Amino acid sequence: MQKSEGSGGTQLKNRATGNYDQRTSSSTQLKHRNAVQGSKSSLSTSSPESARKLHPRPSDKLNPKTINPFGEQSRVPSAFAAIYSKGGIPCRLVHGSVKHRLQWECPPESLSFDPLLITLAEGLRETKHPYTFVSKEGFRELLLVKGAPEKAIPLLPRLIPVLKAALVHSDDEVFERGLNALVQLSVVVGPSLNDHLKHLLTSLSKRLMDKKFKEPITSALQKLEQHGGSGSLSIIKSKIPTYCSICC
């Protein structure tokens, strides 16, 4: 009877010990599994790509990201960019060690201003290279050719709205290019610009409130008066009463 009770107690102890060992083994396996998962997670976060994001390399500054040619932004180019890429503008940018220049496919004086001059004026609103340089330099050089007044004056009704779009643009550099183009045009067409001047002066008046544009706009107005003759002063004063004539 005592033997039976003793063996029964031993069995209970062994069973309890077995359950404890099983629980200990399961707990150990669970800890090991968690440790393995944790190490995998740490490996993924310490990948070269992640490390590059957390600690950018010095070479990243020398190699900035470029526009993806298949991206959404590149699928819808501006009108000027599309014309330029198709060879619709007969000049190309030549990179120099000191400064850039344009290379014309044929002498500029042999080119028709319609619609080339208007297309170049539309390009003044571009904000990316090389379109910014090609448009402003092409516009300037085209107006320097022999016979430019006769070619440019008939285009004024179509040129003025395009120049106005540049002058009302929110980008300061676009505005500056538009302002310079307006002065260049006034040198060529002279008093013929007076009939269209009032459409452009409102935007100049608004920018005149900005200190950084006060001097270049004042200088531009003086040149408009100089090349526009006596009739230009009353037009300028009607839109910008604070303007002081160069004749004063």
From Swiss-Prot:
Phosphoserine: residues carrying this PTM: S47
Keyword Repeat in record: no
InterPro entries cross-referenced by the UniProt entry: ARM-like, ARM-type_fold, Parkin_co-regulated_protein
Biased composition (Polar residues): 1-29
Domain of life, source organism: Eukaryota
Chain spans, region Disordered: 1-71
Residue stretches of biased makeup (Low complexity): 39-49
Keywords: Acetylation, Phosphoprotein
Keyword Phosphoprotein set for record: yes
N-acetylmethionine: modified positions: M1
Protein known as: PACRG-like protein
Natural source organism: Homo sapiens
Taxonomic classification: Eukaryota, Metazoa, Chordata, Craniata, Vertebrata
